[in-house]
Amino acid sequence: MVFTDITGIFNQASVLYMYRNGYIDPATPDTFGGKAAAKVGEFVDVLYRISQRPETDNTALPPDYETEEFNGSACPYYDAVCWAYQAGLLRQGDLHTAYDDDMDYQTACLLIYRYAAMSGIDTRVDQELARQTMRENPRLSGEVVKAMLWCDQTDITTRDSEMGELLAAYDTHINRYQMTSFLFYLCTYELNSRNEA
């Protein structure tokens, strides 16, 4: 299967890996839709699929989170979002928590970082570098800074942005290509290497 809207080999490789493993769906049978904005619901759905869709329920959802648009019969990401709240990947104090919020760099790094920690991966970063980066970027939480540093040191985000660019563009929305690339590198570099150890 080759999606007709993907021209770059880099995007093709990550998309095909994620698609063939059942982690992500295309926009149509022959187009991926990579330039569309990545959404929180889809992002956590990919993580949920990587985790083999564990059983979940809505007990951890914040009050009034369920709506006509977001419920078990109306939203394809319902189970994934419920699971993300139960697992602590999404938290009520986070900046972007609605299933239809656009993903940005800081949210992507934060969710990947939390997922890696939940999966037993070593998420330590250099503490002095973290303190310095927090001082230089006071608009970012300490956890977001550590998440961005960890995603950079593990090469999850470096093909897209160097660390300085990542910090400067922390609130820039990412598209489905970027989402797929980040999660592809999480799978192939971190999760697979841990499973092989």
Question: Where do the model's predicted regions map?
Answer:
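Phosphate/pyrophosphate-binding loop motifs in nucleotide- or prenyl diphosphate-using proteins
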Residues: 22
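Feature responds to low-complexity, polar/acidic, surface-exposed segments characteristic
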Residues: 1-12, 25-44, 49-78, 86-105, ...
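Alpha-helix C-terminal capping/helix-coil junction sites
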Residues: 19, 85-86, 152
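Non-catalytic cell-wall polysaccharide-engagement segments
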Residues: 176-178, 183
